[in-house]
UniProtKB/Swiss-Prot annotation:
RCK C-terminal domain boundaries: 402-484
GO-annotated molecular function: flavin adenine dinucleotide binding; potassium:proton antiporter activity
Physiological role: K(+)/H(+) antiporter that extrudes potassium in exchange for external protons and maintains the internal concentration of potassium under toxic levels.
Membrane-related topology note: Multi-pass membrane protein
Protein name: K(+)/H(+) antiporter NhaP2
UniProt xrefs under InterPro entries: Cation/H_exchanger_TM, FAD-bd_PCMH-like_sf, FAD-bd_PCMH_sub2, Na+/solute_symporter_sf, NhaP2, RCK_C, RCK_C_sf, Transptr-assoc_dom
Gene: nhaP2
Family per record: Belongs to the monovalent cation:proton antiporter 1 (CPA1) transporter (TC 2.A.36) family. NhaP2 subfamily.
Localization (cell): Cell inner membrane
UniProt-listed GO biological process terms: cell volume homeostasis
Keyword annotations of the record: Antiport, Cell inner membrane, Cell membrane, Ion transport, Membrane, Potassium, Potassium transport, Transmembrane, Transmembrane helix, Transport
The organism of origin for this protein: Pseudomonas putida (strain GB-1)
Domain of life: Bacteria
Any one GO cellular component localisation term in the record: plasma membrane
Predominant location: membrane
């Protein structure tokens, strides 16, 4: 490879990445997932479009694994351990039982549609059996879904790859060696994948945390150190026959949920690297496919994709979530619909090609076609489906910017900036009248681009920029304080006619609204009653019905229900109520 060739590669690579970024602006306008657009750019530039011939499967495998490791590390850093209280076991059930059921159901139909042996059909099912972390993290961001749904989908997508990889590799070995039966030793291999991956992921994350917090470096080097550490954990786990995907996700989880030096610098840098990883990975996968090869299999492949979306995934979700009573039908329906397939199935489809199996090219083309259908059908309809199934909750107003205050090594103090519009409730109020959350302070006030020296009597005006020092856990309270009038109206329409305190006694509530206790303990707090009705860990947006009224969890403080909204049937006149 001479200098001219290298320069051409740089030019083509930069043009493709730049084109992907520029064209991605069409994503929100057209309602098409950005990942589909990036795939399309790769396909257009490929052999049937721009004429770029790329058929190097080992290179695609290398790029895909590297990109997924970075994406999962970033996803782990942004996942809050607090979400595990509502989603850990359901997500693990989906990641194991759910993947196996999806594999079996998809494999049976694939074998019938394409006249393959049962074990070859099951291999196709295993390849497309897991949801994709890159697709899920990318498409769920900012959708305002309730915590139970969001946490379940994100944890599932970060932890179901070991099962899919295990099933794929096992079935490839069986086909290559001519085996037709399963053996109990396979269970031991699966436990080893999860065990080694979990142990090295948590242990590697803890070691990285100690290293980052104890060593003094230039600020820009900490994100690079974290990425390097994550890749060490990923590759070492794979070398020991564990799940590198699970390990790097857990490594990020540990780093993201402990006080760590240069936290915001790490998150900002990882955000850019994760985007670059997604763009590079989907460009390479788009270049790898030959579009005209998809046409002969389009009809049966579409049938298989729709079978997986409409039958296999929903049945696997219902079965996997059967023991978890907190999930109602709408949540199960939405989780079924967000069985997004992305880069992982395409990368797994490279395995049979590298192993030289018969019909390996068919497996690859099928995986690519199913991913394309999944992203187009499920990805584009995700916002509409969330509204239809009512799994969204009103989001808390967010600051226009936030930045870290590195007052000490593991400082968690942040500076939040709020712009006060005409519709803000606090316009016209003096600073001393604001009920600031405990532990927060107003640091500065800007008006007409000028820094003021405010006092307690300073009155807030439209257009003011308010800078507040606080912690991340103060954001919900600050969001309510600086909320907009339309936002408050949205809250009332969603949560009900009145909002009650969670510690209000059930007997008092029943007396005020003329409801019958039916043998319930009158001293029981309303929050405890709601928790029992939900049947599991509650989240904001959970609804239960009692005597024709709808009771909705409005705010939470950790595991505790703080406020409950109540909506009465149309045409009824409630009692005096407790409007708080």
């Amino acid at each position: 490879m001479d200098a001219s060739t290298i320069n051409s590669l740089f030019l083509i690579g930069a043009l493709l990445v730049g084109a992907s970024i520029l064209v991605s602006s069409l994503s929100s306008r057209l309602g098409i997932p950005i990942l589909v657009i990036i795939l399309a750019v790769g396909m257009v530039a490929g052999v049937d479009g721009g004429g770029i011939i790329f058929n190097n499967y080992p290179t695609a495998y290398l790029v895909g694994n590297l990109a997924l490791a970075v994406i999962l590390l970033d996803g782990g850093l942004r996942t809050r351990v607090a979400s595990f209280r509502v989603a850990l076991w359901p997500a693990l059930s989906l990641a194991t039982v759910g993947v196996m059921i999806t594999t079996a159901l998809t494999g049976l139909v694939a074998a019938w549609l394409f006249n393959l042996s049962l074990i070859q059909g099951l291999l196709i099912g295993a390849i497309v059996g897991s949801t994709d972390a890159a697709a899920v993290f990318s498409l769920l961001g900012g959708k305002g879904l309730n915590e139970r749904v969001t946490a379940t989908l994100e944890i599932e997508s970060g932890s179901n790859d070991p099962m899919a990889v295990f099933l794929t590799v096992t079935l490839i070995d069986m086909i290559a060696s001519g085996q037709t039966g399963l053996h109990w030793s396979l269970l031991g291999h699966l436990l080893r994948e999860f065990g080694i991956g979990g142990l090295l992921g948590l242990g590697g994350g803890w070691l990285m945390l100690q290293l980052v917090n104890r060593i003094n470096l230039a600020g820009g080097l900490y994100p690079i150190l974290v990425v390097a550490g994550g890749l060490v954990v990923f590759s070492l786990t794979n070398a020991l026959h564990g799940s590198g995907f699970l390990a790097v996700y857990l490594c990020g989880l540990v780093l993201g949920n402990k006080p760590i030096r240069s936290r915001h610098g790490i998150l900002h840098m990882l955000d850019g690297m994760a985007w670059l990883a997604q763009i590079g990975m989907f460009l390479v996968l788009g270049l790898l496919v030959t579009p005209h090869d998809l046409l002969p299999i389009a009809l049966p492949a579409l049938g298989l994709a729709l079978w997986m979306i409409l039958v296999a995934r929903p049945l696997s979700v219902v079965a996997a979530l059967l023991p978890f009573k907190a999930f109602h039908g709408r949540e199960k329906g939405f989780i079924s619909w967000v069985g997004l397939r992305g880069a992982v199935p395409i990368i797994l489809a490279v395995f049979p090609l590298m192993a030289g199996l018969p019909d390996a090219q068919l497996f690859f083309n099928l995986a690519f076609f199913i991913v394309l259908v999944s992203l187009l059908v499920q990805g584009t309809s995700l916002p509409w489906m969330a509204k239809l199934l009512k799994v969204t909750v009103p989001p808390d107003p967010a600051p226009i910017s936030r930045s870290a205050l590195e007052v000490h090594v593991t400082s968690e103090w942040e500076l939040f900036v709020y712009r006060l519009g005409a519709e803000k409730w606090c316009i016209g109020a003096a600073l001393r009248e604001l009920k600031m959350p405990e532990g927060t302070r107003i640091a500065a006030l800007f008006r007409n681009e000028q820094l003021l020296h405010p006092s307690g009597s300073t009155v807030l005006e439209v257009g003011d920029m308010l800078c507040v020092i606080g912690h991340e856990h103060n954001l919900p309270a600050l969001g309510k304080l600086f909320s907009q009038a339309p936002q408050r109206g949205l809250d009332l329409r969603f949560f009900g006619d009145f909002v009650l305190e969670g510690d209000a006694e059930l007997g008092a509530v029943a007396a005020l609204y003329g409801l019958k206790l039916d043998g319930l303990d009158a001293k029981m707090p309303l929050a405890q009653f709601i928790r029992q009705k939900v049947g599991g860990a509650p989240v904001v947006g959970d609804q239960v019905e009692w005597h024709g009224t709808i009771w909705t969890v409005a705010t939470m403080d950790g595991n505790k229900i703080q406020k409950v909204g109540v909506r009465f049937p149309e045409g009824t006149r409630p009692g005096p109520g407790l409007f708080l």
